A protein has these predicted regions:
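Membrane-inserting effector segments that mediate pore formation, membrane fusion
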Residues: 17-59
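Long, helix-rich, hydrophobic modules that act as membrane-proximal anchors or helical bundle/coiled-coil regulators
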Residues: 114-194
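Short, exposed interaction segments that mediate macromolecular assembly or regulatory contacts
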Residues: 106, 110-115
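Non-transmembrane, heptad-repeat alpha-helical coiled-coil rod segments
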Residues: 71-93
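Active-site-proximal loop/hinge segments that shape catalytic or ion-binding/gating pockets
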Residues: 95-99
Length: 194
């Protein structure tokens, strides 16, 4: 199971980096990048830091879910795993100044969907992430059902973030851009399955 765990974590980290790069590349360079020598290096460092930060935030709920799925498969009590998850999600959201019951609930729901997904992957046979998905779901339609459920849960998280942070156009634009990048990456995965 350890090898599968590592395959899943590596695939999710790569997915997070690709989404981040897609979001950052969409942001155009300012005129200062062409006029001020060295601005490229400053921007490169800033974007590298942003990629690292975003990947960390994108991975946090996924890492929680992967670890929880592994603990459940090892025989841990579901109640203790779920209570730890709820506490970890609340602490994480508080650290981001996103303490909202609606957001915590939406995040918990998404993590529960991911736990079910990762449990299937960890129980499946395969030597690659795509093989694990194919063997865990058995059909394109079954996997697509998971993707649709997860996408709806992520949209609910975005709505809760907007509600908490205020109806800010820049925030909405950033969340929409992120959702679009996630959709593009998931479609690419779907093209290679079944």
């Amino acid at each position: 199971m350890n090898n599968k765990y590592e395959l899943i974590v590596a695939a999710e980290k790569q997915f997070a980096r690709e989404v981040t790069l897609g979001v950052i590349v969409q942001q155009p360079l300012s005129v200062w990048h062409y006029l001020i020598p060295g601005m490229f290096i400053i921007d490169f460092l800033r974007r590298t830091s942003a990629i690292s930060r975003y990947t960390k935030h994108f991975m946090f709920p996924r890492q929680l879910a992967i670890d929880a799925a592994q603990r459940l498969l090892q025989g841990y009590e579901k109640e203790s795993v779920n209570s730890r998850l709820a506490a970890d999600i609340e602490t994480w959201l508080n650290s981001l100044h996103l303490d909202s019951p609606q957001l915590a609930h939406a995040q918990q729901h998404a993590v529960e969907l991911l736990i079910a997904h990762y449990s299937k992957l960890l129980s499946a046979e395969g030597t690659s992430h795509l093989e694990l998905i194919e063997n865990a779901y058995g059909s394109r339609e079954a996997y697509l059902g998971h993707v649709r459920e997860l996408t709806a849960a992520e949209a609910e998280i975005d709505r809760a973030i907007i509600e908490k942070m205020g109806n800010n156009e820049k925030l909405k634009e950033k969340l929409q851009l992120e959702a679009k990048q996630v959709e593009l990456r998931r479609n690419r995965i779907l093209e290679n399955l079944f």
